[in-house]
């Protein structure tokens, strides 16, 4: 199609907001890593304003507890931040090492009314099939909530990420509403195959559909072409747009432009950029 119609509105399902102390730690961690220089600010109001200027109607945002003892604090911060951002849709966080992990999850869903959770497996350093969080999956499923999970091995594999343990979770909870971040890179094909058996499994496009993404810097054998036009058409009802903003070292447009350049029917673009997320999240 090439370009969006005038006035087109987006839903971005993958953005990051953190308290200032956590942002500072994250940016320090990335400092000095070639290709991971971030030009964008991190203030929540600024992020919301920027996204609004890009035609973003609603955006999903989250933080993550990288160790025990942080999840309650972060969820309270996310809840308070969401009160100031009418377009924002917060997802909660948990950590399996918290002895009250189920209580934390229930508070996020029932007290704060979060739409679900974000798990970042290789940052939080737990396996997706960790027995301590199986009750959390049960709560997500029972409440019709959504899990956004970074479970692919991109950009830096470690012992916690990867496909097999996530596949095990989906065998246990095949009806779970789940969005796999970054098109499941570097295991995109395996995630696409798993979607055949999991009717509520989605993939988000964040950082995966542009050749400028640092995901591919050290992996020339992978790239946006891992997802074909045929894949986008076949799974047009279960792919959702995400950007990774403001953790994007390239212009925001580069997250959308390569998708618009795919020769897809306008209806497919509308589903990916807006309608699928609107339906899934009940917006």
Describe the role of every protein-language-model region.
Residues 1-13, 22-58, 107, 235-240, ...:
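Mid-to-C-terminal alpha-helical segments outside catalytic/metal-binding sites
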Residues 9-18, 169-172, 178-179, 269:
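A generic "structured core" feature
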Residues 11-15, 59-61, 89-92, 115-119, ...:
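Hydrophobic faces of well-ordered beta-strands that scaffold small-molecule active sites
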Residues 14, 51, 78, 108, ...:
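Conserved, mostly hydrophobic/aromatic
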Residues 17-18, 153, 185, 247:
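Short active-site segment of divalent metal-dependent hydrolases/proteases
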Residues 42-48, 73-77, 101-104, 163-166, ...:
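Alpha-helical scaffolding within the catalytic cores
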Residues 57-58, 66-161, 199, 209-210:
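Active-site gating/metal-coordination segments in enzymes
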Residues 177, 186-283:
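H/E-rich (His + Asp/Glu) clusters that bind or coordinate divalent metals
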């Amino acid at each position: 199609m090439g370009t969006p119609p005038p006035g087109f509105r987006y839903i971005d399902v993958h953005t990051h907001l953190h308290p200032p102390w956590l942002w500072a730690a994250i940016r320090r961690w990335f400092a000095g890593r070639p290709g991971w220089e971030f030009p964008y600010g991190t203030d929540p109001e600024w992020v919301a304003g920027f996204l609004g200027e890009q035609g973003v109607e609603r955006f999903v945002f989250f933080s993550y507890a990288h160790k025990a003892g942080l999840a309650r604090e972060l969820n309270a911060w996310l809840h308070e931040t969401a009160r100031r951002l009418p377009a924002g849709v917060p997802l909660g966080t948990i950590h399996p090492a918290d002895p009250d992990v189920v209580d934390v999850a229930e508070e996020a869903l029932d007290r704060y009314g979060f739409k679900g959770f974000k798990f970042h497996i290789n940052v939080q350093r737990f396996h997706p099939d960790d027995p301590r969080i199986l009750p959390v999956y049960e709560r997500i499923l029972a409440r019709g909530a959504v899990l956004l999970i970074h479970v692919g091995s991109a950009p830096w594999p470690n012992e916690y990420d990867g496909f097999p343990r996530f596949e095990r979770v989906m065998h246990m909870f095949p009806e779970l509403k789940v969005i796999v971040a970054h098109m499941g890179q570097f295991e995109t094909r395996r995630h696409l195959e798993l979607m055949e058996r999991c009717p509520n499994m989605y993939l988000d496009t964040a950082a995966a559909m542009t050749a400028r993404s640092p995901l591919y810097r050290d992996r020339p054998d992978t790239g946006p072409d891992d997802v074909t036009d045929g894949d986008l058409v076949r799974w047009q009802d279960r792919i959702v747009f995400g950007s990774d903003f403001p953790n994007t070292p390239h212009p925001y447009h580069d997250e959308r432009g390569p998708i618009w350049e795919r020769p897809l029917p306008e209806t497919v673009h509308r589903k990916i950029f807006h309608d699928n997320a609107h339906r899934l999240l009940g917006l």
